[in-house]
UniProtKB/Swiss-Prot annotation:
UniProt source species: Danio rerio
Cited function: Possible role in transport between endoplasmic reticulum and Golgi.
Lineage summary: Eukaryota, Metazoa, Chordata, Craniata, Vertebrata
Gene from which this protein is expressed: yif1a
Lumenal side: 170-184, 237-239
Biological process, per Gene Ontology: endoplasmic reticulum to Golgi vesicle-mediated transport; protein transport
Localization per Swiss-Prot or TrEMBL: Endoplasmic reticulum membrane; Golgi apparatus membrane; Endoplasmic reticulum-Golgi intermediate compartment membrane
Any one Gene Ontology cellular component term annotated for this protein: endoplasmic reticulum-Golgi intermediate compartment
Protein name: Protein YIF1A
Cytoplasmic side: 1-148, 206-213, 260-285
Membrane topology: Multi-pass membrane protein
Region (Disordered): 1-42
Membrane-crossing segments per the record: 149-169, 185-205, 214-236, 240-259, 286-306
Family note: Belongs to the YIF1 family.
Highest taxon listed in the record's lineage: Eukaryota
Length: 307
């Protein structure tokens, strides 16, 4: 009996019993390799859905925007930012209006050519009055008599470049010398404008001249300075002094005729008002002194460049 059972076991081994299909499994069957991942579910789906908020957002992110206190803080911060921006723009417009600055750069090629000819040959020009349209002065591109800041700015840059070239030709170029030349020219223009403003204020001269107007008229001298230095480099000292005399006379004539329409023309308007204390001869002194000062500045800023 035992022999038959042992022989039966040797010739016919017992087959592994398959697990029941319907009942739960206490242990995983690892004999045929790892089971697929999608068959394992150690956590309930209800628990996972409770941990993840709707919309796929991380916990706590949606609560910030849903919090009334956070929304109020954001609105208050944006209000403070807008108020600060308005205050900054108001202070900037108080000292330098952007719209007024755009007016002085509203030029075109035709205006630039006419203005340069007027600066070099002002003797044949007849009409010096600035034109208006509905109590607003026309832009420089529509009126050659209107002051601009484009020509003074470009002339100042060209003067600095020409000064660097002149110093390089004479083997005297260095960044320090060129920087000193540029700063000196800029400081002289600032001093001239400040003296002009102070004179108008002390003499109680009521005029429509703005600070930008004075900067423009003061900056036109750089055109004559460019001509003077260029002629000095080409023709030596003789060419320099001839160009200096021509550009100085032309600039003085231009300044007198232009400021005459701004300063002297307001005498009749102020004769019945508070500006009557400013006598006409004082206004004439301001105009003539501003024009007579130009040749000395031109000579001071160009003589060291031509040797």
């Amino acid at each position: 009996m035992n022999f038959q059972q042992q022989g039966y076991r040797a010739t016919k081994p017992r087959a592994r019993a398959s697990p029941p299909t319907g009942g739960p499994m206490l242990f995983d069957d690892t004999s045929s390799g790892p089971p697929p991942m999608n068959n394992q579910n150690y956590y309930s789906s209800g628990y996972n859905m409770a941990e993840m908020p709707a919309g796929g957002q991380e916990p706590g992110v949606g609560n910030i925007f849903a919090d009334p206190m956070a929304n109020a803080a954001m609105m208050y911060g944006s209000t403070l930012a807008n108020q600060g921006k308005d205050i900054v723009n108001k202070e900037i417009n108080r000292f330098m209006s952007v719209n007024k600055l755009k007016y002085f750069f509203a030029v075109d090629t035709k205006y630039v050519m006419k203005k340069l000819l007027l600066l070099m040959f002002p003797y044949t020009h007849q009409d010096w009055e600035v034109r208006y349209h509905r109590d607003t002065p026309l832009t420089p591109r529509h009126d050659v008599n209107a002051p601009d800041l484009y020509i003074p700015t470009m002339a100042f840059i060209t003067y600095i470049l020409l000064a660097g070239m002149a110093l390089g030709i004479q083997k005297r170029f260095s960044p320090e010398v060129l920087g000193l030349c540029a700063s000196t020219a800029l400081v002289w223009m600032i001093i001239e404008v400040l003296v002009m403003l102070l004179s108008l204020y002390l003499l109680t001269v009521h005029t429509d001249l703005s600070t930008f107007d004075l900067v423009a008229y003061s900056g036109y001298k750089y055109v004559g300075m460019i001509l003077t230095v260029f002629c000095g480099l080409l023709f030596g000292s003789d060419g320099y002094y001839v160009a200096l005399a021509w550009s100085s006379c032309a600039l003085m004539f231009f300044i007198v005729r232009s400021l005459k329409m701004k300063i002297l023309s307001s005498i009749s308007a102020d004769s019945m008002g508070a500006g009557a204390s400013a006598k006409p001869r004082f206004r004439l002194y301001i105009t003539v002194a501003s024009a007579a000062f130009q040749p000395f500045i031109i000579y001071w800023l160009t003589a060291h460049l031509v040797r």
